[in-house]
Structures are given as structure tokens and as C-alpha cells.
Amino acid sequence: MEQAAPDPERLWQPAPLEPLSHPDAGLESMVGEETKGARDEGPGDGTMTENNFSLKKIEISVSEAEKRTGRNAMNMQETYTAYLIETRSVEHNDGQSVLTDSLWRRYSEFELLRNYLLVYYPHIVVPPLPEKRAEFVWHKLSADNMDPDFVERRRIGLENFLLRVASHPILCRDKIFYLFLTQEGNWKETVNETGFQLKADSRLKALNATFRVKNPDKRFIELKHYSDELQSVISHLLRVRARVADRLYGVYKVHGNYGRVFSEWSAIEKEMGDGLQSAGHHMDVYASSIDDILEDEEHYADQLKEYLFYAEALRAVCRKHELMQYDLEMAAQDLASKKQQCEELATGTVRTFSLKGMTTKLFGQETPEQREARIKMLEEQIKEGEQQLKSKNLEGREFVRNAWADIERFKEQKNHDLKEALISYAVMQISMCKKGIQVWTNAKECFSKM
């Protein structure tokens, strides 16, 4: 007895996209397979084998920033900052690093590279760029994007971005990234030839999918809430830190007044003059030390800002999943509609009010030949729709599996980096307090000798 063929509509219902296994299961093996695949693939598929670089083989640094003047696309003169990228090979017999490539890049070219990576690797939490303009500044910190201190911090941030990409098991194999480090001329044209702008999802389409998707995956909803919470917590932390920096700066600089008072006082005292002069010197040292302290604090603030911007990278992965889920639901809805039309034509009954029913009443029934032709056309469309739905579902499952693997990698990296940064910040604060105690101890000794 012949078994009835399963109903494709039943098989490919627009349920939330599911991974092939639990996100936590087999994570290490998946990452290992991807890394192994990078070694096994040939140069014809856009990966790097001859020129494959990892942090063990090539050192990447943004060693210098330079202020330049040129003309933009509107033929107007502008001032911008260019950054020198150097790559050094460390695979020589003597163990010495040798400069292989050096070129200059603008911040806008870093942005172009990241936009390309976002389009071609939507399942990856792409590392963020440092801020283009200073945020969460305290009153002594310049918000000018041409300020030398800000440019230096951005140089460090851009170097960190390149190291993040180079250490990623998938992004490091990208040909465009390799050319970014080695090809100064015509790099922009090479990127634009990939046509990545045409493949980018529009903001309107993404917003539409967010509100119209019927069966969102709960895990991605939780991930979106997690990214919002991460951004909120770090934002509050940076704001509090900026306020504390303002107050701390004021407290330290007040000690400069003490130093001046003690120095002037020493000029009119004969017996206590030396002690007052020494105490004033200690106060001046204490007051001037805050500049270096807050400069070190900015380094830790920049590490927090990196993960503030990582929150948007997480949301980009969520938006892509919502788009894929929405496309899947629309494909299933279209398939169901075509099946209903085919059934109505075959039985001659119309279940609901439709334009077809109105035209039939107005102009009469179709001939058997016309009906047969329409049924045949619909059956072909249904067959194509079933294949398309199956393809979208498999594509979605693959996206979820790869996305969760990278999200778990990101969370592990985030926990390690933030823990290290906060511990280092606490150690720095302890050191600062010890120096303060030492200054006041020295001042006390000066007073006791009077």
C-alpha cells in the first residue's frame, strides 16, 4: 500500500528558526571545525593560505597618527587624521620581526571595512570601532576630535579593532581584510566591486520585520534585552566615572593651593621655613599627580566603551535573524495562499470573499481549459514555493547555529576582558590611595620636625 506524501505546508511551518542542536552543545568543536576549514580551503574561494596571517605569525600595529589636509568628494578642502598601519612578519629563523607592509588609512576606510564585514558576516558579532567623537567626557577632557590626546586614544582603539578582527577564526581569513592591510591604492574600489552595499539590509525593512514577525525566537529576544542591559549598565558606569573624575580633579588641585600657601609661609618663617617648604613641595607633587592618574583612567574607560559599542553589534545579529524569520513567514504565507487557490480551482468552491469570486460572478465561469492551465501554473508555483521554504528554513537553522557559536565566543571574551579591566582599575585605585597616604605621611614628618 502506497504511503501518502507528507504535506509540505505541515513540514515547513513558519515556526521560530531553531539551531540544529542546543547553542551550548558542541561549541568548541564547531569553532575548531571552522578554524580547520580555514586551513583546508584553497586560495580560489577568497581565503588566505599563502598570505594567511594569525597573531602568531604577523604583528599588526597602528603606530602613528598624522594630521593631513585634502579635498573630499565635494571638492572641498578638509582636515583629517591618517593612521599608519604596519604589519611585521615574525617567522624568520633569527626570530626577529621584519616589516612587510606599511600604509596610511583614514578613519572612514576603517568604517568601510567594518560595514563590509557586517554585510558578509551577519552571524558574527563584528568588533566595533572606537568613537569618532569623544563621549562621556569630564570638564578637563577635550571633546575636539582633533585633540592630540583623543587622536592617540583613537589610534589605540583602531589598532585594537584590527587585532580583534585578525584574531577571529573566520574574519581573519577574509580577502578584503587582508588587502586592507597590504594594498594602499585602489582598495576602496576593490571593496565597492564586491557589491556589498546592494546586499545590505535597509533600516526600514529591518524595522518592518521587527514589528511584523509573528513567531520570534525567544533566545534572540533575550539576547536583544541582554544587549540593551549591557549598554545601559556601561553607560551609567561611564557617566558616574566622569563625575568622579571631575570631583577628584578638584580635590587634587586644591592641594596645589596648600603647596603655594606653605611655600609663601616659609619665606617669612626662620625656624619653620625648611619644614614648610618641604611640605609645600609634597603638596605640589600630590596636586600634579592627578593628570597622569586620570590619563591612565581614560585607558580603562576606553575598554568599557568598546563593550558599550559591542552592544550594537549584538543587536545587528538579532535584526538579521528577525529579517530571516520574517522572510520565512512570508514565504509560508504565500505558499498557503497558493495552495488555497489551487484547491478552490480544483473543487470549484470559494471559501472566503475574494477578487476571484467577484470576477467569476461578473464575467462568468472560466472554461475547463483555462482552469486546467491555471491549476497547472499554480502547482508549479507551489512546488517552487516548497523548495524555497525548505531552503529558507535550512538557511535559518544554519544562521542560528553559527550565530550562537559566535555569541558564546563573544561572551567568553567579554567576561575575560571586563574582569581584567576592572581588576586593573581597582589595582590602580589602590596604588593611587597608597601614594596619597605616602604624601601626607611625608608632610606629617615635615611638620613634626618643626
UniProtKB/Swiss-Prot annotation:
Location of N-acetylmethionine modifications: M1
Biased composition (Basic and acidic residues): 33-42
GO aspect biological process, one term: protein transport
Region named Disordered: 1-53
Residues noted as binding a 1,2-diacyl-sn-glycero-3-phospho-(1D-myo-inositol-3-phosphate) in the record, renumbered to the chain: R106, S108, K132, R154
Membrane topology, record value: Peripheral membrane protein
Pfam families named in the record: PX
Subcellular location, record wording: Early endosome; Early endosome membrane
Keywords on record: Acetylation, Endosome, Lipid-binding, Membrane, Protein transport, Transport
GO cellular component assignments: cytoplasmic dynein complex; early endosome; early endosome membrane; plasma membrane; SNARE complex
MF-aspect GO terms: phosphatidylinositol binding; phosphatidylinositol-3-phosphate binding
Top-rank lineage group of the source organism: Eukaryota
Coiled coil: none
Domain PX: 61-187
PANTHER family: SORTING NEXIN-4
Function: Involved in the regulation of endocytosis and in several stages of intracellular trafficking. Plays a role in recycling endocytosed transferrin receptor and prevent its degradation. Involved in autophagosome assembly by regulating trafficking and recycling of phospholipid scramblase ATG9A.
Family membership noted in the UniProt record: Belongs to the sorting nexin family.
Domain notes: The PX domain binds phosphatidylinositol 3-phosphate which is necessary for peripheral membrane localization.
Complexes and interactors: Heterodimer; heterodimerizes with SNX7 or SNX30. Interacts with WWC1/KIBRA. Identified in a complex with WWC1/KIBRA and dynein components DYNLL1 and DYNC1I2. Interacts with BIN1.
Protein name: Sorting nexin-4
UniProt organism field: Bos taurus
Encoding gene (name): SNX4
